[in-house]
Amino acid sequence: MLELLKSIDAFAWGPPLLILLVGTGIYLTMRLGLLQVLRLPKAFQLIFIQDKGHGDVSSFAALCTALASTVGTGNIIGVATAIKVGGPGALFWMWMAAFFGMATKYAEGLLAIKYRTKDDHGAVAGGPMHYILLGMGEKWLPLAVLFAVAGVLVALLGIGTFTQVNSITESIQNTTTISPAITALVLSVFVAIAVFGGLKSISKVSTTVVPFMALIYILGTLTVIFFNIGKIPGTIALVFTSAFSPLAAVGGFAGASVRMAIQNGVARGVFSNESGLGSAPIAAAAAKTNEPVEQGLISMTGTFIDTLIICTLTGLTILVTGVWSGDLNGVALTQSAFSTVFSHFGPALLTIFLVLFAFTTILGWNYYGERCFEFLFGVRFIWLYRVVFVLMVLLGGFIELDMVWIIADIVNALMALPNLIALLVLSPVVIVETKKYFNK
């Protein structure tokens, strides 16, 4: 079964999807005139401006909800796995995917506001399934349904539950004697309390926890890097050289081809920042704003924070400490990097980070999956989705690590495909709206 899933994963994240994913970002970057560089200062400025418009939560809360789902195990374990399998060069391709992904995320945020609607309870509803249907017309309904089905699968079987819970249980088991079953049970109880509270409950947790945990984690990685500051030039050089040339086996590292570096860097980058996946615009649609371009700019900062800052710091921490060439993998690899500076406190410190990161990711993805489920079946059966989601959180503590990440990659690909098609079809709308806004 595992070998079959690996074959499907290799096909799903083969050249066609990678080209479509990065190609969409490159195309939007060119058509928008390097907007992710030239308008980045304004984007950060907009985050803290008072919101004026229709919506359910503030733009800052919407961004934090999106970051809650992106700043998760992908930043700690995903980066470690990418480097372990694809070599240091995977970090470079993660940067490239994030840079062009910022333009993709901008387009997603813009379209989320332009084509949002309201559900049967009066709450704002938006995201790819809505901009496919409202922006592209009824004939594209099958594509909207495909996205929504994939979104539910990702939430229940991928990023939303299994990868996060598995990472939490493994990390806690590595640092304590608590069994995965007990951890998963306790976690499912806390998740149930939060998810049955709805979006505002999730946003409240996100706006409180996300900024704090991100700042503390950044300080932790900077401390490790500072103690290895002399190795930075050589590490950066290794990242660039191994991005374009095969890397031989060394120690516990099995070696990596350029294709492996690209595939793992891009796939793990998407897993972490979700640019092109179509999840972030579901949160963006709830923002209290009537200006699509401004929400697009705010959404764009999520990819910058998640990958170009947090993932980069994780990658450098693993590389400068030299643990990447050992026998460890996953969370144990990053824990080992932290322990080189923080001694036996390192694994415990990272476990705290991981639990907070993963918990908020679970909450964010519950909301995404819920909106996709609602699009398919209406608000009447949301309670059923929430019950199944909590059960999947519980089950996540019993699934093998390798299978967890492979399943997550496969369902990610299913979700990204319809969204990327929609972004390309609706790109003229994005370009017209952008020009109209900046020509005011």
Task: For each feature predicted by the language model, list its residue ranges.
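Extracellular/periplasmic helix-exit of transmembrane alpha-helices
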Residues: 29, 108-116, 120, 222-238, ...
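Transmembrane helix-loop junctions in multi-pass membrane proteins
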Residues: 17, 32-36, 74-79, 155-169, ...
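N-terminal alpha-helical transmembrane segments of multi-pass membrane transport
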Residues: 1-73, 83-90, 101, 394, ...
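Flexible loop linkers connecting adjacent transmembrane helices
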Residues: 34-58, 81-83, 87-91, 95, ...
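Membrane-interface loop-to-helix entry segments
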Residues: 20-27, 31, 35-44, 165-172, ...
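Extracellular loop-to-transmembrane helix junctions
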Residues: 9-42, 84-122, 143, 305-313, ...
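Alpha-helical membrane segments and immediately flanking helix-loop junctions
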Residues: 53-85, 111-114, 120-135, 146-149, ...
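Helix-loop-helix module between adjacent transmembrane segments
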Residues: 24, 28-29, 97-122, 129, ...
